[in-house]
A protein has these predicted regions:
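Short amphipathic alpha-helical segments and their helix-coil junctions
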Residues: 20-38, 134
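Short, surface-exposed loop/turn segments at secondary-structure junctions
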Residues: 37, 62-65, 168-174
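Helix-start/N-cap signature of alpha-helical segments
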Residues: 39-43
Length: 213
């Protein structure tokens, strides 16, 4: 499902201003990814911004959740509305390819970098258990738990790119950027489509509403 189809579907819906702005922003970044064909760094970043536009909610001081917990809660809500099992089908079809490659890539496993920086003493045992858990969650159709692992890896990759931890178009991290892009380009349109269908769900307020002056 491309940005053109999503935009057409959005125009056909009557949504609240808050929800319409959220989805319009998310679709615009999918369009950006499509326009930058062949530029994996920019495409992945654009798709992450699109994803971020979907799950970003209003932050309320000290009661705000961490970003990781916030998008886990968001994904759990999406899965409830995924009556066609699109998330599971995506993970099942892609597990032998980009999903498995990403999950088993130590360079997008946050504790590996914490160990490298001397912040923790060990990372290999937890990494092995995480990989084993991913296989188990797939076999038991625990979609939310598997997505949490995948998104955790993607979040680490996002941090590397957004915080200057990687060289643009570098050969060093091509495999994880390519796998991340191949997952996000399929995952994000599903998220937007579900949010569009279940527009009466409370998806929260957007962080930066349009201010009329």
């Amino acid at each position: 499902m491309n940005s053109q189809t999503l935009s057409r579907n959005l125009k056909a819906k009557t949504l609240s201003e808050n929800h319409n702005i959220r989805l319009h922003r998310a679709i615009s970044w999918i369009k950006c990814a499509e326009k930058n064909e062949g530029n994996l760094d920019v495409q992945f970043i654009a798709l992450w911004i699109s994803f971020n536009a979907c799950y970003a909610v209003e932050i309320n001081g000290l009661t705000s959740k961490s970003e990781r917990l916030k998008f886990k809660t968001f994904i759990d809500k999406l899965i409830i509305h995924d009556s066609e099992n699109r998330f599971y089908n995506l993970l099942w079809q892609k597990f032998s390819g980009p999903v498995k490659m990403l999950v088993e890539n130590q360079y997008v496993y946050a504790p590996f970098w914490e160990y490298t920086r001397g912040e923790i003493n060990e990372w290999e045992n937890s990494f092995r258990k995480s990989c084993e858990s991913a296989h188990r969650f797939l076999s038991k159709e625990k979609v939310g738990d598997l997505l949490e692992i995948v998104l955790d890896r993607l979040y680490t990759l996002r941090n590397q790119l957004m915080h200057g931890g990687a060289t643009f178009n570098s050969k060093v991290n091509r495999s994880q950027v390519k796998d991340g892009y191949n997952i996000m380009k399929l995952l994000v349109p599903i998220i937007i489509d579900i949010m569009m269908q279940y527009d009466t769900e409370d998806w929260g307020n957007i962080n930066y509403p349009i201010i009329v002056v």
